Amino acid sequence: IKIFAYAIQIGNVGGEKVDLDFIEKNSIRAADKTAYKKMEKEILDAKRDGDSVGGIIEIIIKNAPKGLGEPVFDKLTADFAKALCSIPAIKGIEFGSGFSAATKKGSEQNDPKKNHSGGILGGISNGDDIIMRIAVKPPSSIRKFGVSGRHDPCIVPRAIPVAEAMTAIVLVDHLLRNKTICL
């Protein structure tokens, strides 16, 4: 089982390609080599202007086993949401195709080859990669409002390892529960 988390958007600049090997090779943990410099510029521009920017972090769990989670009270999605939304500055979460699922027809959304569910159906992992995205708000401490001192213009890079850790905690908790139940 492997957990990857990376920036897919900083401010208004988003990446389209995911290169998992590139994540640890850049300061903002972007996954798109071509968008990285634009994302970095977005942060530097915000800093120069005395402002801040937020972003979106994508989290992928590869090789997650089937059957983690419960259908009602201990859904895997609910536990990930609770853990990840407890991180300061996280303002939203989506799984798989997320909010865009509201605009799809059932025949489009239920395509098992495309993993629109993000690896979780009915609160239980289905063996596909688990895919989540979390929205990170821009820091509120900015020079534009007269706040002095050192403040990060973007906390997305700092939030990524925290998101990985919270994801790992929930995953291990469900692995232990599953192992106990399946004895």
What are these regions (language model features)?
Residues 2-11, 100, 176-183:
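Short alpha-helical "patches" and their helix-cap loops
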Residues 131-183:
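Internal helix-turn-beta structural module
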Residues 50-53, 57-146, 150:
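Glycine-rich anion/phosphate-binding loop at the beta-strand->alpha-helix junction
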Residues 38-45, 79-86, 161, 165-174:
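Alpha-helical scaffold segments in soluble metabolic enzymes
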Residues 1-72:
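Glycine-rich, mobile lid/loop segments that gate access to catalytic sites or pores
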Residues 20, 44, 68, 76, ...:
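Generic detector of leucine side chains in alpha-helical contexts
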Residues 1-9, 117-121, 147-151, 155:
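Short intrinsically disordered, low-complexity coil segments enriched in acidic
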